[in-house]
């Protein structure tokens, strides 16, 4: 079963130029993701998808492969990660499983990826998640005049310990069947 890791690392970030190779604790931030993927032993190939030669060179120096330069059609601010992963899968001749790993996830570990690979034995996807510290059911919204109101009015008087836990994408990775990425299914 061919399993690949795909690390999208576009060079054209508007907020932080070349953020994927900015130093973080002494090395380019992207290298933490590459090292975790390589050290996990889970992947047949760890691929960085980029449009930037400096990022490609840093990825290669870190042990990842850069078998292609991402086409301009997949490099603007409005392209999501699923088409980028699908392109990588196709560019390397297919895969059975693919793991999208964010380049800006310095706290990802090889153990996280091993556990996710194990979870795929029983599930279609494995996703890194984190719990919200405060109950989201107490969330507020603000209108254009600056007035706030409850999003879930039915929970205004509910004790916080009686509210269900809620989770969010921790932005480390999403691991699943390659076919789901190719079919552009929601992850």
Segments from the language model and where they lie:
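N-terminal nucleotide-binding beta1-loop-alpha1 segment
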Residues: 1-17
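Hydrophobic targeting segments
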Residues: 2-7, 30, 45-48
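Conserved SAM-binding loop
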Residues: 6, 22-23, 48, 100
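Short beta-strand/turn micro-motifs composed of small residues
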Residues: 9, 50-51, 102, 129
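A short, N-terminal amphipathic alpha-helix
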Residues: 29-44, 57-61
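Short active-site oxyanion
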Residues: 42-47, 124
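Short phosphate-binding loop-to-helix
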Residues: 47, 53-99, 107-115
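Conserved core of the sugar-phosphate nucleotidyltransferase
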Residues: 80-83, 87, 106-187
